[in-house]
């Protein structure tokens, strides 16, 4: 019997995908497989808008809180664990719903992992030093000049930029040019985004609520676990808003200033997410209502109980 098509629900940060996913999961008896680069970390709760204990008690979730903030975690680990979770869910007669906005993770599942050469520690160290000396924009510009599509895949993530240049300088090709290992499953992507004005309001309100709920204190805790000044910059400190939240906790930035800075960064990231959905996932970005209707129709066809 052929493996079923696995549904994926994605949207920009703050668009409301978690609320929609929870509603559909309760209605159709789904289990949620998270696709978020930072909710995998234990302790990053408020700043990642991780589902609450009550929400997780009402719907089974996978790939949340799987690694400590002091540990490294990469896309290959994510893909292996997410695919194992999907196998387990299907074996129990349930249907998974992949939910998240981290394009790199979604691409790894739906397209497979790039067949790139192994890492070269010496080259990696040299590039990390170059990153500190020249800055992220200079290294990104080097990728952009050689392969604009590869540059778009980087999402301004320093680790991805370093890895891309490591592979390029060693082999003359970027990771995305090596082809991909076959994905374990086939996926149907349902992508949505509210109108721009609504998104702006949602981002602003969400940011303010997260800061009031204790995000600065969470960032202060994180700094005690993983100093943000470490070089290379720790992965957990690449999460949106944590640097600003820490600045609030340390009295270096006002709450209002942090709110504006984080909201701006979130809107900019949301635009990059939409670009990734269209270019890398091949998704049609619909209105929330249209995406929900299409996903419901998919679930009805799949035989998910309602």
UniProtKB/Swiss-Prot annotation:
Superkingdom classification of source: Bacteria
Binding site for ATP: 11-18
Upper taxonomic lineage: Bacteria, Thermotogati, Deinococcota, Deinococci, Deinococcales
Gene: miaA
Amino-acid positions noted as binding substrate in the UniProt annotation, renumbered to this chain: 13-18
A Gene Ontology biological process term: tRNA modification
Subunit structure: Monomer.
HAMAP family referenced in this protein's UniProt entry, alphabetically: IPP_trans
InterPro entries registered for this protein in UniProt: Dimethylallyltransferase, IPT, P-loop_NTPase
Protein name: tRNA dimethylallyltransferase
Record has Lyase as a keyword: no
Cofactor(s) demanded: Mg(2+)
One matching Pfam family: IPPT
UniProt keyword Magnesium, yes or no: yes
Family: Belongs to the IPP transferase family.
Chain's role: Catalyzes the transfer of a dimethylallyl group onto the adenine at position 37 in tRNAs that read codons beginning with uridine, leading to the formation of N6-(dimethylallyl)adenosine (i(6)A).
Residues annotated as site: Interaction with substrate tRNA: 102, 124
UniProt-listed Enzyme Commission number(s): 2.5.1.75
UniProt KW keywords: ATP-binding, Magnesium, Nucleotide-binding, Transferase, tRNA processing
Provenance organism: Deinococcus radiodurans (strain ATCC 13939 / DSM 20539 / JCM 16871 / CCUG 27074 / LMG 4051 / NBRC 15346 / NCIMB 9279 / VKM B-1422 / R1)
GO molecular function, one term: tRNA dimethylallyltransferase activity
Substrates-to-products reaction catalysed: adenosine(37) in tRNA + dimethylallyl diphosphate = N(6)-dimethylallyladenosine(37) in tRNA + diphosphate
